[in-house]
Amino acid sequence: MAEITVLKIAPGKHPAKTKLKSTIEAFNRAVSVGAVEIGKACTKKMEKDIYILYNYYGCLDELPGNRQVNGEIITGTFFVLGATQGYRPRSLTPHEIERYSSLFWDPEVYSDTDIIKNSMDVLYDSLVELEKL
């Protein structure tokens, strides 16, 4: 399977350009650094064709807080990657690498209380949106 060029955003560190195999198994392993078990990788849309790949259950696995993305504290290591119009993973362009390296350059620190409160806020907001349907 092909490899794609992505940005790795680890807790407490600056972003690093790296390669990932473009498979579900590789994605699951990549987002499970520090977890007891292999997690389930999921994506969160940042922009039109830019996504983050992260461990949805990172909070439950007590992974450390990393960065805040669209109002949600992401726990554990996550990756920034591109997607084609057909939603297939693709490499970031040099411009995208520069842009997202700058965006996530400064490490952020969160307490367990911050992470739990944020998780509850995100859950509440999701429930409010569901009620509107």
Predicted regions and their residues:
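Short beta-rich binding modules
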Residues: 1-133
